[in-house]
Amino acid sequence: MTEIMNDEQAAERIAKGVPIVEFDHVCLGFEEHQVLKDISFKVAHGETRIILGPSGGGKSVLMKLANGLLLPDTGDVRILGWSLQQMTQRELFQMRAHVGMVFQESALFDSLNVEDNVAYRLEEEHVDPQEIHERVVEALRFVELEKAIDKFPSELSGGMRRRVSIARAIISKPDLILYDSPTGGLDPITSNTIIDLVVKQRDVSGTTSLLITHRLQDAFTMATHRYNEQLGHMEKIPNGGIDPNTRFLVLNEGKVVFDGTTLELSHTSDPWLKDYIS
């Protein structure tokens, strides 16, 4: 399988309605502990899938499977229809060029300034230096940090580091963004700023995403708000509206206990789910 997932092939598959992400009866365990048990779900183009569940339920492991950092024991993980299990390491590297990732820890290079951190992926792809600079400025402007371009991570607050991480994730205009607890460890005001940027990326760029959060408030804010480009920030959808492209996946003890819409989750009759979201 050569030149897997080049831009043209990816665009063709998106146009045909191929799911961006598909887990098909995925199981994964470490030694005798089964972490994920028969996980199946699909994520369509333009959809935001919010992944909820108690700590230790397998959420972060699921995210690593979606990026090919782990492979399942059984079942299949597909990105745009391509099976990750069938890829060589080179092909997995090519696949990751279509995936942006935002970690809770930000995972910035402390020895590089903001510009070089954001530019890192494009430099690895040998993009023209002038184009790299222009795209870095564009990405930093998106997260409202263009004035921090020459600063180093040690000079940034936790929230600013997280915003740089988002800029780095979006600079290659990926088909999929994986947000692993992007507001973890942040205060409520800073968390709201990060969610504002996630909603902005969803509504302005239409990027497909998986997002893990431990904050139910963040999840339901995303589902009930939209980004207003004229105002420059997100706003509540009028008349109790709900974003149609935001759906939920809830894991508990390694199993999918809910896969559906915001309304379906809000009106669930399942006792465990009702207690979890209350």
What are these regions (language model features)?
Residues 151-154, 172:
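Conserved signature/switch motifs of ABC ATPase nucleotide-binding domains
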Residues 82-83, 123, 130-148:
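Conserved ABC ATPase "signature" region
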Residues 192-205, 224-226, 237-240:
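Helical segment within the ABC ATPase nucleotide-binding domain
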Residues 177-180:
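Catalytic Walker B motif of ABC-type/P-loop ATPase nucleotide-binding domains
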Residues 67:
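Helix-to-loop junction immediately C-terminal to a conserved catalytic motif
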Residues 112-119:
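Short coil-to-helix segment of the ABC ATPase nucleotide-binding domain corresponding to the Q-loop/switch region
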